[in-house]
Amino acid sequence: MAVPARKTSKQKKRSRRGHIKLTTPAMHYDATTGEYRLSHRVSPKGFYKGRQVANENKQQNND
């Protein structure tokens, strides 16, 4: 099994991880409902790409 010959320093470790960060979610304006929502998701009112694909009052329980 391979084992590192030397301990990785804090600077080396942190500089390697420097590009790893959180990104803001892609929000888009939904003209049908007049609200902002996440991309590629059904809106809370049940609309997707301008068409109603789910009922607003229907709630699913995954118990």
From Swiss-Prot:
Region (Disordered): 1-25, 42-63
SUPFAM superfamilies: Zn-binding ribosomal proteins
GO biological process entries: translation
Segments of skewed composition (Polar residues): 54-63
GO cellular component: large ribosomal subunit
Basic residues bias spans: 7-20
InterPro entries for this protein: Ribosomal_bL32 (IPR002677), Ribosomal_bL32_bact (IPR044957), Ribosomal_zn-bd (IPR011332)
Database matches in NCBIfam families: rpmF_bact
Entry-linked PANTHER family: 50S RIBOSOMAL PROTEIN L32 (PTHR35534), LARGE RIBOSOMAL SUBUNIT PROTEIN BL32 (PTHR35534:SF1)
Family named by the database record: Belongs to the bacterial ribosomal protein bL32 family.
Protein name: Large ribosomal subunit protein bL32
Gene: rpmF
